[in-house]
Amino acid sequence: MASILGDLPSFDPHNFSQHRPSDPSNPSKMVPTTYRPTHNRTLPPPDQVITTEVKNILIRSFYQRAEEKLRPKRPATDHLAAEHVNKHFRAASSSSSTQGL
């Protein structure tokens, strides 16, 4: 069993070389290294404010789907209703199924 799990990337300590401990006294909290530009071509605008969402993304999607279900459907227009008048539906022929008996 160990040979099957031996090639997994989690056993390779070099996979985690990009992380450094945020606090040397507590090495369990790892934070990734961040990019610090050496030029100002990619600096964000000075008035930019980054905020986090108050609602969790999963809860937000539940609320959005619930609102979509509650939203009233639009009524069919007269133009669409006129097209469907010309359609004829087949009657369920019970006589064809009884003829074989």
UniProtKB/Swiss-Prot annotation:
Keywords: Nucleus, Ubl conjugation pathway. Its main location: nucleus. InterPro entries: DDA1-like, DDA1_dom. GO terms for biological process: negative regulation of abscisic acid-activated signaling pathway; positive regulation of proteasomal ubiquitin-dependent protein catabolic process. Residues 1-48 are annotated as: Disordered. Pfam families: DDA1 (PF10172). The keyword Cell membrane does not apply. GO terms for cellular component: nucleoplasm; nucleus. It comes from the Eukaryota. It is found in: Nucleus, Nucleoplasm. PANTHER family: DET1- AND DDB1-ASSOCIATED PROTEIN 1. Belongs to the DDA1 family. Involved in ubiquitination and subsequent proteasomal degradation of target proteins. Associates with the CDD complex and mediates the recognition of specific substrates for CUL4-RING E3 ubiquitin ligase (CRL4) by interacting with ubiquitination targets. Binds to the abscisic acid (ABA) receptor PYL8 (required for ABA-mediated responses) and promotes its proteasomal degradation. Acts as a negative regulator of ABA-mediated developmental responses, including inhibition of seed germination, seedling establishment, and root growth. Associates with the CDD complex, formed by COP10, DET1 and DDB1. Interacts directly with DDB1A and DDB1B. Interacts with PYL4, PYL8, and PYL9. Interacts with SGF11. This is DET1- and DDB1-associated protein 1. It comes from Arabidopsis thaliana. The gene is DDA1.
